[in-house]
Amino acid sequence: SRMVPVINKHGGVVDKFPGDGIMVMFNTVTKSDTYAADALRCVDDMCAACVAWGKEREAKGEKALELVWSVAAGPVVFGAVGDTTRLEYTVIGDSANMAAKLEKHTKEEAVHGLTTKETFDLAVSQGYQPPTPRNTLKTRIVGGVDEPIDLVTLVE
């Protein structure tokens, strides 16, 4: 419930809550010419909210949560998937799959957030200015991706 207002602020729409995650879409329900920048700004603000939440938890003697983030931009199909017995609205496509693969890949890179260099460059061209310097990770092998790709850290 803490993240949804942040997501809404940046024009994102929650697709689903798979397991302990949140799948968010940009530029699907509401058109945006800055969708990649919106997504990365959203991650920045969610990270800040998580830091504050972690401090609250630690003040109560609870453990802060360790969260990870991934962002991939590209075309998706948005709509109903399934049949008459089970129908679900969702997004499918290469960028949705890439985001899932990047989320898993954060462990290999020992970081808390990743995006593709292509998505990062698109966000910058849309006006995104990272609040802290980002590191580019060249020619990384990501499980399930055919060719090596360049990545950018979102959260170290």
Task: List PLM regions with ranges.
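Short beta-strand/turn "edge" motifs
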Residues: 19-23
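Cytochrome P450 core scaffold surrounding the K-helix E-X-X-R motif
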Residues: 80-82
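Cytosolic regulatory/linker segments at or just downstream of nucleotide-handling modules
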Residues: 76, 105-156
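Alpha-helical scaffold within the catalytic cores of cyclic-nucleotide enzymes
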Residues: 1-12, 28-69, 73, 94-104, ...
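Short beta-strand-to-turn element immediately C-terminal to the catalytic PLP-Schiff-base lysine
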Residues: 25-27, 154
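A short pre-motif secondary-structure segment
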Residues: 14-16
